[in-house]
Amino acid sequence: MRGRWHFRCFSLALSPAAPDLVLRKPSIFTVQTEIFTLCDAATVAAGKLNILGSFDTIGAQSFPCDHPLCAVACKLRFDVGEEGRHWLEMHFCDPDMRPVLKPIRQDFEIRIPGHQSQTHIHIWQHLGFHLELPGEYYFELKVDGDTKSRIPLYVVQAQRR
């Protein structure tokens, strides 16, 4: 999923009665992941997502080790036509794609007044986890069962000073 792009297309239609060009929005909707990041902390204030210390690498002097505290911040965009009940799930897997944490699930509802897309912000706070070995771990975001984003967490052997 890394580096995957979603393109929105508009189609042109010519009507015999009105030969002017008409732009039509696509009829297929896709939830868009605007932000999905591992960070030191995150908050929402006045509808704004505030992220402190986004990172993708941690080091440990020895293994196994514990990472005591972090957060994962997520901002999704829903288009008109995607109203209703949804659920999201966050998975954290080791380099062999085995779960490090139990999947964390949240149910929510999207309401779209008018014709403007809406965002949903979710923050998983106070995450702590146990890491057996160095390697490339993954946080994966699923919306309604579909994988929307996967980000790496690089766990490395820290250099002694």
Each model region followed by its residue ranges:
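Leucine-biased recognition of intrinsically disordered, low-complexity hydrophobic segments
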Residues: 12-14, 21-23
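Intrinsically disordered, low-complexity segments enriched in proline/serine/threonine
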Residues: 18-21, 28
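Contiguous segments within soluble domain cores/interaction surfaces
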Residues: 25, 29-134, 138-161
